């Protein structure tokens, strides 16, 4: 009986020792200790033992890219297709680590070339993203599908293009990767390469048959920041600040006056240099790539055929108070109070006096017309002052009135720019314009008092500046004010189906 108990105890101790040894094996592999791993193998450790997450020693060797450790484990019988708790196999980790030799070792030991992670990411996609050509070629040679897609329909070619791995892109194309694979967002490998500024990859894809003037076409409504339908590779490159790539696209035949998004490349550069408003003022311009500045690119763009005075046929509004139809790149630059760009365009032959279809002039835009959120939009008061001063020096009509009844003084009131108001007064603005109501019944003073779209507080400094100038000219600041209904009140009344007087909109 005692011998039986002793035998059972010995068996339990041996089992415990084996378990401890196996745990030590996984720990040694995680620590990257190849010598300890070999010692554990020699002592009889279970090479397929896994930790609580299902990770084996071979997983760790693959993750670390340790070829010699992996070779020792494979020779000892490690399962090359073992999955951890997340469904990840060693070969996927080897592709992530970028070790082509390790990928080849695992494939030759029987690893599945079509192995994928949760979500459908194949080993080939992973290798394409990390850019290891040896790994990609080994996977393709063992039957990996170059056109497999993950749950978002992205392919290995898209990933390699986005990451800029030109040799991998060439290998995938040679293996039959589908050049026309396109996401619902409209993005294909070329658009991915252009967005990320991968000039070499873009050239390779164009040589493989892409049209440099093809238009992006979205099939679904985007949930996040998106590229517009009709956008060309050239416009996409400009919007992301990749000016050297944009020049390469122009050299490949891109249309310098492409207007399919509603805006030409020259119009587009205005908001790339000074992006749209945010809660903290103007957002920074994109970092982009290359050594070509935005102004140097503008010069090159015009030299390559861009029409510096191109007037837009149409296009969705970028500022609720300015109609973009008929607007020139210079008017857009004035709207941003971007004096360096304005001067560059002038040197290239821009007409500083051309208005849009409603008669809104660059001077009005520079002074602030179109501003819907003062202090949150591109163009500071000082920049608006300098832009206004420049246009006045060029002979811009300070007394012009557009078809909405707006004047340059209305613009300064919208922008809440008292120094611009003072400049206009000193430059001879007709005092009668200071009491000129627009089509909504708003004078510059009324706008400063808060009679404008949305819920605005009065601008005391602007009011004081206008009142002082008006009183000095003998113009009354008194009189009836238009009925003002704020945004939230309008919504409430709309729900009650109450007709709102158009003059209050």
Kindly give the residue locations of the regions a language model identified.
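Ankyrin repeat domain, specifically the short helix-to-loop turn at the C-terminus of the second helix
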Residues: 41-45, 71-79, 104-112, 137-145, ...
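Conserved ankyrin/ankyrin-like repeat signature
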Residues: 36, 68-69, 101-102, 134-135, ...
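Ankyrin repeat A-helix N-terminal signature
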Residues: 27-31, 60-66, 93-99, 126-132, ...
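Start-of-repeat signature of ankyrin repeats
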Residues: 54, 87, 120, 153, ...
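Ankyrin repeat boundary/linker residues
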Residues: 51, 84, 117, 150, ...
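N-terminal segments that cap or nucleate solenoid repeat domains
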Residues: 20-60
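Ankyrin-repeat-protein effector appendages
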Residues: 19-27, 142, 208, 225, ...
């Amino acid at each position: 009986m005692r011998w039986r108990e002793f035998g059972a105890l010995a068996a339990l101790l041996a089992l415990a020792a084996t378990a401890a040894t196996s745990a030590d094996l996984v720990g040694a592999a995680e620590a990257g200790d190849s010598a300890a791993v070999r010692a554990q193998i020699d002592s009889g450790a279970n090479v397929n033992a896994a930790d609580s997450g299902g990770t084996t020693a071979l997983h760790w060797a693959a993750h670390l890219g340790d070829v010699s450790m992996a070779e020792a484990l494979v020779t000892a019988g490690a399962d090359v297709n073992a999955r951890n708790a997340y469904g990840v196999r060693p070969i996927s980790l080897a592709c992530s680590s970028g070790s082509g030799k390790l990928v080849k070792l695992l494939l030759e030991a029987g690893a599945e070339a079509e192995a994928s992670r949760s979500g459908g990411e194949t080993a080939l996609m992973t290798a394409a993203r990390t850019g290891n050509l040896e790994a990609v070629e080994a996977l393709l040679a063992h039957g990996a599908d170059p056109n497999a897609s993950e749950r978002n329909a992205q392919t290995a070619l898209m990933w390699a293009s986005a990451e800029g791995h030109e040799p991998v892109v060439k290998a995938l194309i040679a293996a039959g990767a589908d050049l026309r694979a396109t996401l619902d967002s409209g993005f294909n490998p070329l658009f991915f390469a252009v967005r990320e500024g991968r000039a070499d990859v873009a050239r390779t894809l164009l040589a493989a048959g892409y049209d440099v003037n093809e238009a992006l076409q979205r099939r679904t409504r985007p949930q996040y920041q998106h590229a517009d339908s009709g956008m060309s590779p050239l416009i996409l490159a400009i919007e992301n600040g990749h000016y050297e790539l944009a020049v390469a696209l122009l050299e490949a035949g891109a249309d310098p006056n492409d207007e399919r998004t509603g805006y030409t490349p020259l119009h587009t550069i205005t908001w790339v240099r000074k992006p749209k408003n945010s809660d903290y003022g103007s957002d920074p311009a994109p970092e982009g790539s290359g050594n070509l500045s935005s102004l140097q690119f503008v010069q090159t763009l015009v030299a390559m055929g861009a029409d510096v005075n191109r007037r837009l046929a149409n296009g969705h509004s970028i500022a609720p108070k300015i109609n973009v139809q008929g607007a020139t790149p210079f008017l857009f630059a004035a709207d941003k109070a971007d004096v360096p760009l304005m001067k560059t365009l002038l040197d290239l032959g821009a007409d500083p006096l051309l208005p849009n279809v409603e008669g809104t002039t660059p001077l009005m835009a520079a002074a602030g017309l179109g501003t819907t959120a003062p202090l949150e939009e591109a163009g500071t008061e000082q920049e608006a002052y300098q832009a206004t001063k420049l246009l006045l020096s060029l002979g811009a009509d300070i007394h012009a009135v557009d078809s909405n009844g707006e004047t340059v003084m209305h613009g300064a009131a919208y922008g809440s720019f008292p120094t611009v108001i003072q400049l206009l007064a000193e430059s001879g603005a007709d005092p009668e314009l200071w009491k000129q109501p627009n089509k909504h019944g708003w004078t510059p003073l009324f706008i400063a008092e808060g009679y404008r779209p949305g819920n605005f507080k009065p601008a005391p400094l602007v009011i004081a500046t206008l009142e002082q100038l008006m009183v000095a000219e003998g113009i009354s600041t008194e009189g009836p004010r238009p009925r003002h209904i704020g945004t939230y009140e309008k919504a409430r009344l709309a729900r009650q189906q109450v007709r709102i007087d158009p003059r209050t909109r």
